């Protein structure tokens, strides 16, 4: 009914489980170790109502600020009118998963650390240092290619000469 205003109202499609994904979740979701400062994504699991966050936080990414035996404290930014408010939620671990938002950053950080380690070794040997990647670049165009072979026939394309139709 459209006028009923319960806590989980209008979540029929939002909280639905994926195809062949019904029933209880794996134990690995509960046993995952979260530390303070980790980025997590809130994805509500409707098969477990305990510790289920409000529907407005479904799909949001936040940081862990508190770890309890049965719940994880997550800080999430929420837009309220014309400002952004930090909300602190306690969520059951079934409804959160590690976020991949820092994956690219951590990979680049590890790559830069490896280059710096190589540069220390090269400096001791007196060889030129490797350049550090300054910032991320968009995908570059493909390099030029040479076409080899005498059997390739080229045709010159030119516009037709204008002829008056009147």
Swiss-Prot record:
One of its GO terms (molecular function) is structural constituent of ribosome. InterPro entries: Ribosomal_eL21, Ribosomal_eL21_CS, Ribosomal_eL21_sf, Translation_prot_SH3-like_sf. One of its GO terms (biological process) is translation. It is found in: Cytoplasm, Cytosol; Cytoplasm; Endoplasmic reticulum. Signal peptide: none annotated. One of its GO terms (cellular component) is endoplasmic reticulum. Gene3D superfamilies: 6.10.250.3260, Ribosomal protein L21. Component of the large ribosomal subunit. The ribosome is a large ribonucleoprotein complex responsible for the synthesis of proteins in the cell. Component of the large ribosomal subunit. Belongs to the eukaryotic ribosomal protein eL21 family. This is Large ribosomal subunit protein eL21. It comes from Entamoeba histolytica (strain ATCC 30459 / HM-1:IMSS / ABRM). The lineage of its organism: Eukaryota, Amoebozoa, Evosea, Archamoebae, Mastigamoebida.
